[in-house]
């Protein structure tokens, strides 16, 4: 029996049959199907902060302040988000609040590009 045939056979099982299969595999091999819980000693604070920064792959672009040129910042926000004029203006006016997220869950490079565009327009931006 090939691995593909085994997978096909498993796909045809009902939920109760799958539960029974898991139980028998646990008993046979002396293992558990529970998700492993990672327990590690607390690393040195400086090393932990550096590692956390490196591991982060998605960022939120947060508007801290629109600076002196609100109109230009609104134009850039519209360009980035595709929002209408009123929605972009409302978002820019939330600057400094937790709701002032221009874009969330974006890759690092895109987040940095957005930050650069907004800063060129005079805004103060933070990546979270």
UniProtKB/Swiss-Prot annotation:
GO terms for molecular function: mRNA binding; structural constituent of ribosome. Signal peptide: none annotated. It comes from the Bacteria. Keywords: Ribonucleoprotein, Ribosomal protein. InterPro entries: Ribosomal_bL12 (IPR000206), Ribosomal_bL12_C (IPR013823), Ribosomal_bL12_C/ClpS-like (IPR014719), Ribosomal_bL12_oligo (IPR008932), Ribosomal_bL12_oligo_N_sf (IPR036235). GO terms for cellular component: cytosolic large ribosomal subunit. GO terms for biological process: translation. Forms part of the ribosomal stalk which helps the ribosome interact with GTP-bound translation factors. Is thus essential for accurate translation. Homodimer. Part of the ribosomal stalk of the 50S ribosomal subunit. Forms a multimeric L10(L12)X complex, where L10 forms an elongated spine to which 2 to 4 L12 dimers bind in a sequential fashion. Binds GTP-bound translation factors. NCBIfam families: L12. Belongs to the bacterial ribosomal protein bL12 family. This is Large ribosomal subunit protein bL12.
């Amino acid at each position: 029996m090939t691995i593909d045939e085994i997978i096909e056979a498993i796909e045809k099982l009902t939920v109760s049959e799958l539960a029974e299969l898991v139980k028998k595999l646990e008993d046979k091999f002396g293992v558990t199907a529970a998700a492993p819980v990672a327990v590690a000693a607390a690393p040195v604070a400086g090393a932990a902060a550096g590692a956390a920064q490196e591991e982060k792959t998605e960022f939120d672009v947060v508007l801290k302040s629109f600076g002196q040129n609100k109109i230009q910042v609104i134009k850039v926000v519209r360009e980035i988000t595709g929002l209408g004029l009123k929605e972009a203006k409302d978002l820019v006016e939330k600057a400094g609040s937790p709701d002032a997220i221009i874009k969330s869950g974006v890759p690092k490079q895109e987040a940095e590009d957005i930050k650069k565009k907004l800063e060129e327009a005079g805004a103060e931006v933070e990546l979270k």
